[in-house]
């Protein structure tokens, strides 16, 4: 693997690392193939960078502090020779925003093309479907939960307005699992949900409404085919839209007993709710 020394953050070869604004990275084309514009994303920290290297996403480059070359040597030796590894003195790396997070290990990955929905729905499942979630912490936590609870089976599908799993914060909170858990956007929303039924997948909409059933009760009746289930979760504030609810086969909730004072929480954080429901279904 070619080690490329750099001595300044102004070096044009490391332009990807100068601005870590996610929207700018999303619009950035490959200088070697501008026509194939898909944008890039940033991986921060050793754990996330290692997961990127083992994921289906292509690595464009790495940037390491000089002190991190030896600890990363095993990974560097496995990289294709076309992936440059830029190495900079500590004072240069310190100028990159978020040093306390990346600790001198960064990488740029290339976004893939759109996934085929039919191929994804043919996967084993279960499926987690997110409508308009905008909090990157929650997105990252949901991907981490899916990796922990669903193993290799879970697929995540996103409405067009759901936050980007490859944004730096989402990716960081997911511990890099957003690179490993299969996911795609459903551009025709919510009409795409009708394709679940055609694929034999039962859609369960999570909502605390009176017409919903405890997810554990519903899960008990699905023991023969737990993988052919899609768990539909809505935005942090308003929950699922009326249109999304109308496509569901059933509405489910997480029953919460009263606390010591007799008060009952009206809802759970969406990432926590996803984890509890997935655990019940699996």
Label each PLM-derived region with a short phrase:
Residues 70-82, 169-170, 243-244:
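Short, aromatic/basic amphipathic alpha-helical patches
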Residues 3-7, 47, 54, 85-86, ...:
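RNA substrate-binding interface of SAM-dependent RNA methyltransferases
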Residues 78-98, 184-187:
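A glycine-rich helix N-cap at a beta->alpha junction
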Residues 105-107, 145-149, 165-167, 172-177, ...:
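Structured adenosyl-cofactor binding patch, chiefly the S-adenosyl-L-methionine
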Residues 204-265:
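Active-site/ligand-binding-proximal alpha/beta "capping" segment
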Residues 67-69, 90-92, 161-162, 186, ...:
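Short, acidic/turn-prone active-site loops that include or flank metal/cofactor-
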Residues 46, 67-68, 92, 112, ...:
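Short glycine-rich anion-binding loops that position phosphate/pyrophosphate groups of nucleotides
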Residues 1-73, 162-164:
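Boundary-proximal intrinsically disordered activation/regulatory segments immediately upstream
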């Amino acid at each position: 693997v070619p080690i490329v020394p750099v001595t300044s953050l102004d070096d044009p070869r490391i332009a990807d690392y100068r601005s870590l604004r996610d929207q700018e990275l999303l619009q950035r084309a490959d200088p070697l193939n501008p026509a194939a514009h898909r944008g890039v994303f940033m991986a921060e920290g050793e754990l996330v960078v290692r997961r990127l290297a083992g994921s289906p996403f292509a690595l464009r480059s790495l940037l390491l502090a000089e002190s991190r070359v030896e600890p990363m040597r095993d990974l560097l030796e496995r990289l294709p020779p076309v992936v440059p590894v830029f190495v900079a003195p500590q004072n240069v790396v310190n100028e990159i925003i978020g040093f306390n997070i990346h600790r001198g290990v960064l990488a740029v990955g290339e976004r893939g093309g759109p996934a085929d929905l039919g191929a994804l729905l043919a996967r084993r499942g279960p499926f987690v479907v997110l409508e308009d979630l905008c909090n990157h912490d929650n997105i990252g936590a949901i991907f981490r939960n899916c990796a922990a609870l669903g193993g290799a089976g879970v697929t995540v599908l996103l409405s067009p307005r759901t936050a980007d799993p490859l944004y730096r914060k989402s990716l960081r909170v997911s511990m890099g699992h957003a690179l490993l858990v299969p996911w795609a956007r459903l551009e025709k929303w919510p009409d795409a949900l009708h394709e679940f039924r055609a694929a034999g997948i039962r859609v369960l909409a999570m909502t605390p409404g009176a017409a919903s059933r405890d997810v554990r009760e519903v899960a008990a009746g699905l023991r023969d085919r737990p993988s052919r289930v899609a768990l539909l979760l809505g935005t942090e504030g308003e929950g699922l839209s009326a249109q999304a609810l109308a496509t569901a086969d059933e509405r489910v909730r997480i029953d919460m007993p009263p606390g010591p004072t007799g008060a009952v929480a009206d809802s759970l954080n969406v990432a926590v709710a996803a984890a509890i429901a997935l655990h019940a279904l699996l």
